[in-house]
Design a protein with these regions (language model features):
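ATP-binding glycine-rich loop module of kinase domains
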Residues: 34-128
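Activation segment signature within eukaryotic-like protein kinase domains
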Residues: 186-187
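Long, solvent-exposed N-terminal ectodomains/accessory regions
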Residues: 1-60
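Conserved structural core of kinase catalytic domains
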Residues: 91, 96-115, 124-127, 135-181
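C-lobe/activation-segment region of protein kinase-like
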Residues: 215-278
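Conserved hydrophobic alpha-helix
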Residues: 190-197
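Catalytic-loop of the protein kinase fold
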Residues: 197-215
Length: 278
């Protein structure tokens, strides 16, 4: 299957991959998702590229067409339809497809669409039980009866970007950061949001500084892709490295509270050490 000559304009996702060896990790190629003639494709490239516009189409291999059913679930009348004209302070969350090559070979080739549907149901519940420290959901963006994205309120910045614009690892940041601005109210906001989720029988399961937005001094919890009901399995549920206990395999309230404590230590409050191993 040939690729378009102006591939750079149609590349949706690119990600370098690495494989482990006795001598450490080594570069194994670049994964790419691109659009051609209205269809989406997943491919692998042999080289590194600084920009999608530099992609050498002759390097494309393992090309797979991604069926719509793999990433866009069917819209149901029970769901909220997003406004046709979205507010300026909003954005559309669309599914990431960079791992589709692996997913397509598994037992759940439509798991991306299933995960989108799961997150929609979580947001619909949260919409009925709104809270100032939980992201505002505006509804589903729909095309031809399929959910193409989730429309959400947009917030200025993450807690991670505010505290750690240099993307230092959390231990190095903790050891070098001088505590200045008071973030106790932010921690209280995060806890209020967590407690609200727990009152609904939900656990976020991925509380970390990149999933906390800051808006006029208020903390808002975002990204409910890993959110599960209390007691549910966390098998195949994505969580953020360094911010969760890898031994925990089920959705427990303590998962969120432990992550909140990790953020508190990360912000420099107290002398405790980090719980989660790098």
């Amino acid at each position: 299957m040939s690729a378009p000559p102006n591939l750079g304009q149609d590349v949706l996702e690119m990600n370098e991959t690495y494989e482990d060896s006795d001598n450490g990790f080594y570069f194994a190629g670049t994964l790419m998702v691109y659009r051609m003639n209205g269809n989406l494709y997943h491919a692998k490239l042999k080289a590194r590229y600084s920009s999608p516009s530099n992609v050498n189409t002759n390097d494309l291999e393992n090309i797979i067409q991604i069926p719509i059913s793999a990433y866009n679930p069917t819209f149901s009348a029970e769901f909220t339809l997003a406004p046709e004209t979205l507010p300026t302070n909003s954005f559309v969350k669309t599914p990431r497809l960079i791992s589709y090559d692996r997913i397509s070979q598994g037992l759940r080739p439509n798991s991306i669409a299933e995960d989108v549907l799961h997150e929609v149901r979580i947001y619909e519940l949260l919409r009925r039980h709104a809270h100032p420290n939980i992201a505002t959901y505006l509804g589903c963006q729909v095309s031809n009866g399929m959910i193409t994205g989730l429309c959400l309120q947009k917030y200025p910045r993450t807690l991670l970007k505010e505290i750690n614009p240099g993307s230092l690892n959390k231990r190095h940041l903790r050891n070098t950061r001088v505590v200045g601005k008071d973030y106790t109210s932010i921690l209280a906001d995060i806890e209020r949001g967590i407690r609200h989720l727990h009152s609904l029988g939900l656990v976020h399961n991925d509380i970390n500084p990149n999933n906390i937005m800051i808006d006029n001094g208020r903390a808002i919890i975002i990204d409910f892709g890993s959110c599960r009901k209390l007691g549910e399995s966390l098998e195949d549920v994505g969580r953020t490295y360094e911010w969760y206990d890898e031994k925990v395999k089920h959705s427990f309230f303590e998962n969120d509270l432990a992550a909140l404590e990790e953020i508190r230590v990360w912000l420099g409050y107290g002398e405790e050490t980090f719980q989660f191993v790098e």
